[in-house]
Amino acid sequence: MPSFDIVSEVDLQEARNGVDNAVREVESRFDFRGVEATIELNDANKTIKVLSESDFQVNQLLDILRAKLLKRGIEGASLDVPDEFVHSGKTWYVEAKLKQGIESAVQKKIVKLIKDSKLKVQAQIQGEEIRVTGKSRDDLQSVMALVRGDDLGQPFQFKNFRD
């Protein structure tokens, strides 16, 4: 019986490469000359810290970071950025978390979406992923298109496709 898994993962190596590319661009940009502006990836916490001297510059750094991550294949929706920036002394910073795994509320929405579609497939929650099984490969591909088309605030990957 054909099946596949719906997961939401961020490749940390690609995230590190995107952060390095963003740092390289910031170092060469004229508007960041003589300004304390850094972007750091913390592998242990899976967070990216963006620090600068003003909140406007933090927004610019976030835009640069999102563009570089997108070029590396990491969607902007996989970055959880708080609305408020932290002001400490003369610097502003924000710690953005990389979304790893699918939260239980989003999992339930996906399962409900699949069941409401009336396709002949089964969806089961397994930890931080969802296993979808069905009799025909076409139904599974329809589920993939359905999940991709619905905006659930998080990018999804499809793994372990088996016939």
Curated annotation (Swiss-Prot):
Leader sequence segment: none
Keywords: Nucleotide-binding
Family classification: Belongs to the YajQ family.
SUPFAM superfamilies assigned: YajQ-like (SSF89963)
Gene that this sequence comes from: yajQ
Source organism of this protein record: Salmonella typhi
Protein name as catalogued: Nucleotide-binding protein YajQ
Disulfide cysteine pairs (residue numbers): none
GO cellular component terms given for this protein: cytosol
Short name of any one Pfam family annotated for the protein: DUF520
Molecular function in Gene Ontology: nucleotide binding
